[in-house]
């Protein structure tokens, strides 16, 4: 693997590649203009939160027994039982119309 060349030890034709280049100067036209002033940032509105408004969420991953009991009656039946009940209702409505 070749060794890295340092600017101090530059020799021959590689010397031009290794020499440090001076930064380019700005044109007189650009340097004559002052920099545009930065617009002042608008103050952000902060909302004040009352310390007592935070609600208790409880432990994550656990459900209260009250919530489980309330959900049991309203959850749709598993394995399509709910669909079977709906089908029976539509059939009975069709029988009444005939």
Swiss-Prot record:
The UniProt record lists the keyword Nucleus: yes
This protein's UniProt keywords: DNA-binding, Nucleus
A molecular function (GO) term: nucleosomal DNA binding
Subcellular localization: Nucleus
InterPro entries linked to this entry: HMGN_fam
Gene Ontology CC annotations of this record: chromatin; nucleus
PANTHER family documented for this protein: HIGH MOBILITY GROUP NUCLEOSOME-BINDING DOMAIN-CONTAINING PROTEIN 3, NONHISTONE CHROMOSOMAL PROTEIN HMG
Protein name (database record): High mobility group nucleosome-binding domain-containing protein 3
Organism from which the protein derives: Gallus gallus (Chicken)
